[in-house]
Amino acid sequence: RKQGIDVVIIDEVSKSSFLDLLIPILYGKTVILVGDHRQLPPMYDLRHMRDGDFEGLDENIITKKKNDLYTALYEECFFKTLYERVPDDFRVMLNKQYRCHSHIMEVFNHFYGGNERGLMIGKKQQDDEKQHGLTVKVNGNIIIDPEHHIYFVDCEKKESSEDGSTSKQNKQEASVIMELLNGIDRAALELISKGKIRVDKERQIDERPSVGVICTYGDQAGLIKKRRKGIQYKGFSQKDDEKLIISTVDDFQGDERDIILVSMVRNPRDHRFNAEFVKQFERINV
């Protein structure tokens, strides 16, 4: 403890509050913060405070000033504050991405200044390497083909809530997710049978796609987990760090899968709702 650390590197720093970073920063002679302040900031439990609702609270315990201080310490992304204030010589934007196909990049590039000033493909052959190659059919109809890499599915049914829960779920979306999982599994198994996806346990080769389901609400993730219980998807990757994951946006940040299904959940009956955390562009960006 008496000796400082020459270089401290802190990864996934966007979800770290000022207090989270304080100790490692104090120990480092040189500190390198790595993260994306356009993704989710630290989580904040007193959600009812976000709308400024202080009615009925004992001001000796919680005041607006104290709440603002708490927010600054625990909820705000300290990395974002630093990045926007430090001189240009102390910051760098890594604008080449190697994770996804350009079709997907064009969508989230809206959060990074648009296609002209945002992220770019890291390798010329990247689009070829990111081809999913799947032809997914549901009820005999092709709904996913190898030429396209991002799809939007319109669900008309309304959201609902379980008794006593403040979370939301959308049963139609859950059904669509299950149909898609089954369709992707069938398509992958077909490619395996044709030798286009290699699986060889003895040689430790597993080219099956990894799949993830991300939900904006915990109850929706729970509903989909319940529906897929007992179902084995043999067309999906079985590697320990690539197995099928069904989770919320907040829990998934920092992880990745070859194929992602997103359940937005919200579709209120009166077309009016207060969904502050869904409106956060950082959550959609993740």
Segments from the language model and where they lie:
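Conserved helicase motor core of SF1/SF2 NTP-dependent helicases
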Residues: 2-286
